[in-house]
């Protein structure tokens, strides 16, 4: 048992080192108050939302499938029937989802809303080898059944939740009725088609790009301030931003607050974090992206601290000072040039007059 545990940890560590791709599709079917159903399919690859399908039962003909990120244009160019095929597949799933929603609403009852979710995911290495897969179905925000680990056995939900416990017989019956053939189909999809498309997508997505990091201080007041650190233009989207104070992470009561990870149109991500700190202390922002790490020093000086003799940074004053400095240097150079020209002219004139006087004396001597 211990050997298997150590082997599992080793495999996970190796995947961390060599890299792993994650392809996930999420399906959400919702019945509204008018008994109209909408189905939305979202495709996510390595944390990037790359595909969306949407349809409403009131207008099935308007179903649409779209790539939602720049590199999907290259996928569509390489596979011209890709979006049409995804739309046709979404239309087929819509009919199945509508039937499942009706059955679940009758069996489990209408609660706050009628929402059926379905998720499947495959994890692959950089060279395209299958690592792990997952299949799961949920109702109103709770998991009903899952296929994971070795992908051979479906498991049920957490029956500690009251309404799930009340419907345990129905849910267990649904799981028991899943045939081995259906399980094999799902397993083959995760190990086959899902893995193959993960390899295809990896060939079109942007290469690994490390972030541009900017850090500083804002909202400075008395002896408190906020240190911020923002990372721009990185891919993939997994990043860790921390603040270091005297070699240690900031205390737990000053845990950094991070804004949501946001994608950009070029396929990269950006994220910013900030933390409340004390003035007159030095901090460091440490950003880790994969095996790449950078540290940005952040120094905070109290606005009331005049003992240092430093003038507070003021952009307008600095600009005026820089302009005056440049003007002074140019004026000094001009004066030096004029002085040099005057000395040169004076020396030349003096030499000319001396030669003229010598020539006059020589002429006078000869005439005598």
Curated annotation (Swiss-Prot):
Recorded hits in Pfam families, A to Z, give: C1-set (PF07654), MHC_I (PF00129)
Q: Which GO terms describe its biological process?
A: antigen processing and presentation of peptide antigen via MHC class I; negative regulation of type II interferon production; receptor internalization; symbiont-mediated perturbation of host natural killer cell mediated immune response
InterPro entries in alphabetical order: Ig-like_dom_sf, Ig-like_fold, Ig_C1-set, MHC_class-I_related, MHC_I-like_Ag-recog, MHC_I-like_Ag-recog_sf, MHC_I/II-like_Ag-recog
Region annotated Alpha-3-like sits at: 209-303
Q: Where is this region: Alpha-2-like?
A: 115-208
Q: Where is this region: Alpha-1-like?
A: 19-114
Question: Which segment of the chain is annotated as a signal peptide?
Answer: 1-18
Q: What are the annotated GO cellular component locations?
A: host cell membrane; MHC class I protein complex
Q: Which domain of life is it from?
A: Viruses
Membrane-spanning parts = 321-342
| Record's bilayer topology term | Single-pass membrane protein
Subcellular location, record wording: Host membrane
Subunit structure of this chain's protein = Interacts with host LILRB1.
Biological role stated in the UniProt entry: Plays a role in the protection against host NK cell cytotoxicity by interacting with and modulating the activity of the host inhibitory leukocyte Ig-like receptor 1/LILRB1, which is expressed on monocytes, dendritic cells, as well as subsets of T and NK cells. UL18 exerts an inhibitory effect on LIR-1+ NK cells, while it stimulates LIR-1- NK cell. These modulations prevent lysis of the infected cells by NK cells.
* PANTHER family per the UniProt record, alphabetical: MHC CLASS I-RELATED, SHKT DOMAIN-CONTAINING PROTEIN
Q: What is this protein called?
A: Glycoprotein UL18
* Lineage summary: Viruses, Duplodnaviria, Heunggongvirae, Peploviricota, Herviviricetes
């Amino acid at each position: 048992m211990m050997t298997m545990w150590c082997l599992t940890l080793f495999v996970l560590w190796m995947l961390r080192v060599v890299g792993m791709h994650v392809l996930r599709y999420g399906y959400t079917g919702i019945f509204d108050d008018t008994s109209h159903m909408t189905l939305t399919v979202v495709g996510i690859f390595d944390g990037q939302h790359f595909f969306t399908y949407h349809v409403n039962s009131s207008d099935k003909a308007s179903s649409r499938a779209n790539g939602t990120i720049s590199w999907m244009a290259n996928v569509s160019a390489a596979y011209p029937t890709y979006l049409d095929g995804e739309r046709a597949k979404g239309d087929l799933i819509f009919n199945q989802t509508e039937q499942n929603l009706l059955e679940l609403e009758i069996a489990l009852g209408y609660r706050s809303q009628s929402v059926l979710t379905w998720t499947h995911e495959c994890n692959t290495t950089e060279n395209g080898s299958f690592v792990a897969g997952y299949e799961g179905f949920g109702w109103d925000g709770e998991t009903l059944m899952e296929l994971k680990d070795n992908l051979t056995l479906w498991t049920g939900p957490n029956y500690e939740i009251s309404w799930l416990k009340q419907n345990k017989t129905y849910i267990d019956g649904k799981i028991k009725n899943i045939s081995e053939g259906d399980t094999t189909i799902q397993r083959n999809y995760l190990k086959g088609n899902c893995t193959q498309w993960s390899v295809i997508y990896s060939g079109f997505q942007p290469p690994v790009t490390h972030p541009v990091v900017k850090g500083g201080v804002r909202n400075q007041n008395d002896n408190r301030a906020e240190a911020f650190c923002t990372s721009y233009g990185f891919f993939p989207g997994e990043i860790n931003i921390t603040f270091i104070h005297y070699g240690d992470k900031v205390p737990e009561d000053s845990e950094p607050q991070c804004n949501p990870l946001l994608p950009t149109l070029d396929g990269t991500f950006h994220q910013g974090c900030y933390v409340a700190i004390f003035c007159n202390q030095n901090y460091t922002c440490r950003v880790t992206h994969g095996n790449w790490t950078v540290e940005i020093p952040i120094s905070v000086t109290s606005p009331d601290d005049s003992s240092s003799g430093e003038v507070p940074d003021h952009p307008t004053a600095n600009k005026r000072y820089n302009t005056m400095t440049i003007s002074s240097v140019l004026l000094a150079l001009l004066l030096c040039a004029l002085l040099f020209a005057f000395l040169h002219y004076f020396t030349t004139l003096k030499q000319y007059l001396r030669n003229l006087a010598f020539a006059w004396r020589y002429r006078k001597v000869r005439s005598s």
